[in-house]
């Protein structure tokens, strides 16, 4: 379970929500009108002969997988990534709406945060690269906006349901604190007071430190 609170969404429900996301925020080139595709054929920031649309599909797949990795790492990391994705989606929707009112607008086709990927994924060809711009006049903005809005709504619901999972109700964190308490109370080596915890994500490591450090200092006088 994610939390000791029975009202909190389950891992199964989160998995189903994540895998049902369109994540079309990362695939704008799929919505380019056929008549305009040639204009972007040479547009790429890739290695080898990977097309922009191919790269975008790769990023979308990586992000979907990585969201689940983030959840496995900590609910805190998962919420941070979901919030960043929603912010990007909402900004893009605002840009589309601005275009509908005022006309010409260019939009960055590519925007991912390396903080949301583990070390292995940041070395992937899909992630490394610079932004490329797309003219919204060349895009089926109606279809794209519909998918973006659906994702924004679903992510918003997920974030709302996860608000209750504070550190006090984070079951994974509380289980870790119990393990630390047991190790310190019943040490194999009484002279070894170090606590070493590994994580693939820097923000998970910081989240754990921020919650473990005051706990062991208050309870055991350790720094």
Which stretches of residues belong to each language-model region?
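Helicase motor interdomain insertion/brace
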Residues: 1-223
């Amino acid at each position: 379970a994610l939390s000791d609170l029975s009202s909190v969404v389950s891992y199964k429900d989160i998995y189903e929500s994540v895998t049902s996301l369109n994540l079309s925020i990362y695939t704008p080139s799929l919505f380019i009108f056929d008549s305009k595709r040639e204009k972007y054929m040479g547009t790429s920031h890739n290695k080898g002969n990977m097309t922009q649309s191919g790269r975008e599909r790769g990023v979308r797949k990586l992000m979907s997988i990585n969201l689940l990795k983030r959840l496995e790492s900590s609910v805190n990391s998962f919420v941070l990534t979901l919030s960043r994705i929603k912010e990007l989606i909402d900004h893009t929707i605002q840009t589309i709406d601005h275009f509908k009112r005022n006309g010409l607008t260019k939009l960055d086709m590519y925007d991912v945060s390396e903080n949301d990927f583990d070390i292995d994924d940041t070395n992937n060809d899909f992630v490394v690269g610079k932004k490329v711009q797309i003219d919204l006049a060349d895009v089926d903005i109606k279809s794209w906006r519909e998918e973006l809005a659906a994702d924004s709504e679903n992510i918003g619901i997920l974030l709302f349901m996860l608000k209750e999972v504070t550190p006090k109700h984070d079951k994974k964190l509380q289980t870790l604190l119990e393990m630390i308490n047991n190790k310190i109370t019943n040490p194999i080596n009484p002279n070894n007071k170090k606590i070493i915890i590994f994580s693939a994500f820097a923000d998970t490591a910081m989240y754990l430190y921020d919650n473990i450090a005051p706990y062991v200092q208050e309870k055991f006088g350790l720094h």
